[in-house]
Amino acid sequence: MAELTISSDEIRSAIDNYTASYSPEASREEVGTVTDTSDGIAHVSGLPSAMSNELLEFPGGIVGVALNLDATEIGAVILGDYQNIQEGQEVKRTGDVLSVPVGDAFLGRVIDPLGAPIDGLGEIESTENRALELQAASVLERQPVEEPLQTGIKAIDAMTPIGRGQRQLIIGDRKTGKTAVCIDAILNQKANWDSGDVNKQVRCIYVAIGQKGSTIAGVKAALEEKGAMEYTTIVAAPASDSAGFKWLAPYTGSAIGQHWMYQGKHVLVVFDDLTKQAEAYRAISLLLRRPPGREAYPGDVFYLHSRLLERSAKLSDALGGGSLTALPIIETKANDVSAYIPTNVISITDGQVFLESDLFNKGVRPAINVGISVSRVGGAAQTKGMKKVSGSLRLELAQFRELEAFSAFASDLDAASKAQLERGARLVELLKQDQYSPIPVEDQIVSIYLAGEGIFDSVPIGDVRRFEKELLEDLKHSAAGVYSSINGGKALDADNAAALIAATNKFKEGFIASDGSRVVNEAEADALGADEVENEQINVKRKTVSK
């Protein structure tokens, strides 16, 4: 057997070759140290080059956001479980600002504010990211809000219309139906989504901030039942999450929506609700020892909401003509809309829908107070048909409310006032809707027009909603041409109006009220002419009795 021998020259040559080809990989890394931590906030020393809003890496893969940049230390908000963060642990810079993955893969999913799925349906494949803090579109990049976004709620679409690119505040006390109004708006986009027309389709994002987990699950179940989850993304920061997640959740939803908007698509974002985001930001600011202001909120709480809501826009045609519509929700206490956060958001948005607890308790649902609800876009965001029939609706309801209050103290009213009260009561009944049951705009136009023409005046109040439902089903066949005209974007002309009235009167003849009576108006007697006054004749018909 041959003996294996290696000469020292060969060993020396191999070592020389290795050292000649070796190039050490040196990397420079800034490392800081946690000086103290509590309640989701960590103070870190030793990161002199850290940027504002930069992501920091804590042990265990937990990340934080640098908010306070002081001379000797950084105040960071920990995103995630902060129970294991301890004093003395190392913290590293990432060099990245806070961003979230975006794309169509997020439709139908439930995610946390960092874009991670929490619905148990697997990972979300995404190739693009978008920073959470991005500048809103400039004035020259926008165009006026003129395209309607139908909510399916008669009281809103008729009197406080919402346009694509608008910011409409939904405000009211707790348990007055604020979330239900926004969910109805999402459900009403189903027909547009099924049409397959990109110009009609609206992608929806529901951002739940500080809500109970069961509430978020209920919203998801309602959307799934109606087939709306296929075009909806839910960003969830439930009450059990840290203040950092509640603070960031609206920006995550907005970033995902902006991605679609700049692709020329239309987006609806619901922020439920911004009161809890402001409270979370207040907690963060106080823990970071920032000076408190009114109601202990920090001085930049207005900027917190303004930079979020200013991202809503209808982009110019040069940028694709996409839109981002925002429905922020604010919770009031005892109907006080003059508190700090409500007045801030009212001044930022393009109108508000005020839901009143007294109306809700009376059974008026949605409990919209049309007196102080307003849309600054107005008729520009309505179809021609709706704009024509809804012009006097707000005035009639306002006069009804005023007369109703007066009649409580009046013992006797004239016939005209009684008729106005009767019609107003039927208008209020007509504007009621069941939860999660949006109504197509063509049905809304027909109902409001017929109410204005007095068709419902002879219908008992308890039968108004049943009469409306059965009438609309009948008119879709007996007045199909009128519906086609309305769907084509046209206003009701004289011929269509006459056809609608004729078909309605025919249906009315066969309608039986719940008490068994008919609702057909009796024929009105013609007034006497001037030459007939004081010359009236009475004709007496005698009955012959057979014996």
UniProtKB/Swiss-Prot annotation:
The keyword Disulfide bond does not apply. InterPro entries: ATP_synth_asu-like_sf, ATP_synth_asu_C, ATP_synth_asu_C_sf, ATP_synth_F1_a_nt-bd_dom, ATP_synth_F1_asu, ATPase_a/bsu_AS, ATPase_F1/V1/A1_a/bsu_N, ATPase_F1/V1/A1_a/bsu_N_sf. It is a peripheral membrane protein. It comes from the Bacteria. CDD domains: ATP-synt_F1_alpha_C (cd18113), ATP-synt_F1_alpha_N (cd18116), F1-ATPase_alpha_CD (cd01132). Its EC number is 7.1.2.2. ATP binds at G172, D173, R174, K175, T176, G177, K178, T179. HAMAP family: ATP_synth_alpha_bact. Produces ATP from ADP in the presence of a proton gradient across the membrane. The alpha chain is a regulatory subunit. PANTHER family: ATP SYNTHASE SUBUNIT ALPHA, MITOCHONDRIAL. This is ATP synthase subunit alpha. It comes from Rhodococcus erythropolis (strain PR4 / NBRC 100887).
